Amino acid sequence: PRELADRVGVVGQDPLAGFVTDTVEEELAYGMEQLGLPGDVMRKRVEETLDLLGVADLRHRALRDLSGGQQQRVAIGAVMATHPRVLVLDEPTSALDPTAAEEVLAAITRLVHDLGVTVLIAEHRLERVVQYADRALYLHGDGTVASGRPAEILATSSVAPPVVELGRLAGWDPLPMSVRDARRAAAPLRERLAGRT
């Protein structure tokens, strides 16, 4: 519905399939043109979006010539230029290498912190995104849904990133959500093991 278009932005997992223009700048402006925003507002928002997502140097580049991570950031930027309150991302890191995935997740984090946008991510690679999440939803096979802090949900779910599985096996509380968390939790164990040699 039209009223949701102003509030919710959606980015699919294949950004190139969703692009409707040829260049970065045109793509960032397209959604605003469809909403009938004045030219001066569009120009200002395009500049802000280019800066916020770190793609200003790509302004005149053809979308098809961008890397996967750059395409994903432009797709997110094109949606964000319309100023939605909620951003829905379908597997935003699925086709990206680890470095590009980190760049996209850093851009998403900036959106949350700088603009106060609510971001909903559907992702199979939990290890990439769980450390960024404030809340998690786990959809059980029987149709029920568990909701809570990521550590609460992952403590009992049948699906968890390897670092969480390690935390379960080691009996760590709280469970680590990132490798950094696991290193902190393992520090006392490393010290004990170092004392034995």
Residue ranges and their predicted role:
Residues 83:
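Conserved catalytic motifs of ABC-family nucleotide-binding domains
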Residues 98-100:
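Helix N-cap at the start of a conserved alpha-helix in ABC-type nucleotide-binding domains
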Residues 40-58:
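Conserved ABC ATPase "signature" region
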Residues 139-176:
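Conserved beta-strand-loop-alpha-helix hinge in the C-terminal portion
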Residues 79-80:
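ABC ATPase C-loop
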Residues 62-66, 70:
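Conserved ABC ATPase signature
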Residues 87-90:
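Catalytic Walker B motif of ABC-type/P-loop ATPase nucleotide-binding domains
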Residues 123-124:
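H-loop/switch region of ABC-family ATPase nucleotide-binding domains
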